[in-house]
């Protein structure tokens, strides 16, 4: 078998284990120990999802990264940028989405940013608005395109997510289907 095949198998196993960790984060109640809206809280989520899978689990990256033609925040200024993002207000839906978009631009980890940040976003929305995103209703292509355009204009991602808010914040099915959808956005599909 070619080496590429083995890489695909390894990545799929990492995603599968990380997904199980995400389920456990909620089922165990450990989600209630996460610091909401902070960089530390995002690091806690990332560590929980990827501990034992990546040596950098929960650690702020120290190298530059990009996806496609987009370069995320420069590693030299990342901690300063994260400090500014942390201070952003969380009093309205618009402000929360603005903070979410800025955290996505920062992309503090080498891998696993989207999965971690979507959980982080839901915690902020739940705390301040009593709502979460019903991710299972958010189309993958529309979401990824809106996020790609969000550094220029966050209106599209705001409308997309606002149309899929629910106040059923403790519904187990919404939570777990949302986690699965989050992994699907990143290319993982359960067998």
UniProtKB/Swiss-Prot annotation:
Its EC number is 2.7.7.108. SUPFAM superfamilies: Fic-like. Gene3D superfamilies: Fido-like domain (1.10.3290.10). InterPro entries: Fido, Fido-like_dom_sf. One of its GO terms (molecular function) is AMPylase activity. The keyword ATP-binding applies. Belongs to the fic family. This is Probable protein adenylyltransferase HI_0977. It comes from Haemophilus influenzae (strain ATCC 51907 / DSM 11121 / KW20 / Rd). The lineage of its organism: Bacteria, Pseudomonadati, Pseudomonadota, Gammaproteobacteria, Pasteurellales.
